[in-house]
Regions:
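A structural signal for short, hydrophobic/glycine-enriched beta-strand patches
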Residues: 30-150
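N-terminal type II signal-anchor transmembrane helix
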Residues: 2-36
């Protein structure tokens, strides 16, 4: 006597579809990561802290003349400008004229708000955002949401 198989239950179908959607979403995310910006000049650079290499990259872009102003958002309140300059080899003249240490943000959303205030205060029209590739979409989204629509 042959046993009839019971069709998969609703729970298994939903779980399978959920897993498939997650895998496809992850593949989309991983394969379409944003690429580094070209050498185009912008008015300013915004770098959000949190990972190695971001600040040195921003300083390289600033020194190369790809922007005239730099905001480093999310700096710990314990970090003093002199300590920052010593850590990253920043000349006092460059620190004074061109670099703003932003102490107001603690997460990606507040990075966007802090950066938007800085962009408005500096009257900048174009900016370059520096963060990690996997963080770029979220950081760009939060920054765009905080900037005015003009």
């Amino acid at each position: 006597m042959r046993r009839l198989r019971k069709p998969p239950g609703l729970f298994r179908r939903i779980a399978s579809l959920t897993m498939l959607a997650w895998v496809l979403g992850f593949l989309w995310f991983a394969l379409l990561l944003p690429q580094p910006a070209d050498d185009r000049t912008t008015d300013g650079i915004v770098v959000v802290t949190g990972g190695g290499g971001r600040i040195p990259r921003a300083l390289t872009e600033l020194r190369a003349g790809h922007a005239r102003k730099l905001l480093i958002a999310g700096v710990d309140r314990e970090v003093k400008p002199g300590d920052f300059a010593a850590e990253y080899g920043v000349e006092p003249r460059l620190l004074q004229c061109c670099i703003t240490l932003g102490y107001d943000s603690v997460d990606t959303r507040s990075n966007g708000l802090e950066a938007a205030r800085w962009v408005a205060a500096q009257r900048l029209h174009s900016i370059r955002l520096i963060t990690t590739d996997w963080h770029m979409r979220r950081a760009a989204f939060d920054l765009a949401a905080a900037l005015p629509d003009d």
